[in-house]
UniProtKB/Swiss-Prot annotation:
Organism: Desulfitobacterium hafniense (strain Y51)
Classification lineage: Bacteria, Bacillati, Bacillota, Clostridia, Eubacteriales
The protein's name in its UniProt record: Large ribosomal subunit protein uL18
Record Gene3D superfamilies: 3.30.420.100
Family: Belongs to the universal ribosomal protein uL18 family.
HAMAP family, sorted: Ribosomal_uL18_B
Amino acid sequence: MITQIDRKAIRMKKHKRVRKSVFGTAERPRLAVFRSLNHIYAQVINDELGVTLATASSLDAEFKAAELAGGNVEGAKKVGDLVAKRALEKGVSKVVFDRGGNIYHGRIAAVAEAAREAGLEF
């Protein structure tokens, strides 16, 4: 019998393993990226306090005003740019990148590159 691969379970397993070493502090918060089929979300999180410092997603009003889709690379670049600008406004310039168990490719890489171009260091 052929068994089907549970890709979500594999991603969650990878994410758990990575989260053991990726930890956001006040000096270097964690830039966490979550990717769904139609949208992308990014948060800057201080894990010591359990506080989200900045957030951006493809559901934000600024994103929708640009008339982009959240399920493609162009939309992911816009989300990366938005989260970086909001983090810099809060005084955060250095972060630790958390890809959420996803492969560093496509939309995940686009968020990271756009955040770097907008001024975040990681």
